[in-house]
Design a protein with these regions (language model features):
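Low-complexity, disordered linker/stalk regions enriched in Pro/Thr/Ser/Gly
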Residues: 1-215
Length: 215
């Protein structure tokens, strides 16, 4: 039998070379996000600043994984998540953090008008004018003929501008700024498939901050 053995002393803590939320995105519309952690010699990790784990004292060590799905705390705003790793002999890294903004708000669209409730394709009676504004800054908007008051933005038919209608689509509208729109009878007829009738016209806005559409 041998009269000796080898004993390794390891006092070097592992490091975290990269830590991101949703691949470095600045905004998320969901509380469920994916953490990406790059580290050498990590055997375990603990994460805090998430739902149910407010501080490091609340966090528990778990097996290290380079990718981890977590739930952010509720409520819109800036969210900072922290991670720390340790090796197999409990040398701990410094904490690393990453920040993302949770934004789940959708624009509220308010219509003023219209000036008339019936139009034809005859000059002098062929234009409906209204305006709208948004509670949030928009990156896009569209005016559509929809099947129901509660239709979503991907329902219905986009009203065109071939007949002279204006501002049926657009980009970059500041919050609380009024935008005037005109619907011409020929464009309404095209969207309606040429059939007379009473139709629901709805304006949809897409928020600049998170790309969510109004309801």
């Amino acid at each position: 039998m041998a009269s000796y053995f080898n004993l390794t002393l390891d006092t070097l803590a592992p490091t975290i070379s990269a830590f991101t939320i949703n691949s470095g995105a600045s905004v998320t519309t969901s509380t469920t996000v994916t953490l990406s952690i790059t580290s050498t010699d990590a055997a375990a990790m603990k994460i805090w600043g998430i739902n149910g784990v407010a501080s490091e004292a609340d966090a528990s060590w778990e097996t290290f994984s380079s990718s981890k799905s977590v739930t952010l705390t509720s409520g819109d705003g800036s969210k900072t998540v922290y991670v720390k790793v340790r090796d197999s002999v409990y040398n701990e890294s410094a904490a690393s953090s990453a920040t993302i903004t949770l934004s789940t708000a959708i624009p509220t669209i308010t219509i003023t008008g219209p000036d008339v409730n019936i139009i034809s394709e005859q000059s002098g009676k062929n234009i409906c004018t209204f305006s709208f504004s948004s509670s949030m800054a928009l990156k896009a908007w569209k005016v559509k003929l929809v099947p129901a008051n509660n239709s979503a933005h991907d329902a219905g038919t986009q009203i065109g501008t071939t007949g002279g209608s204006t501002n049926m689509t657009g980009t970059t509208l500041a919050a609380s700024t009024s935008k005037e729109c005109k619907i011409y009878g020929s464009d309404l007829s095209t969207a309606a498939g040429g059939a007379d009738g009473t139709y629901i016209i709805k304006v949809f806005g897409q928020a600049s901050v998170n790309s969510l559409w109004s309801a």
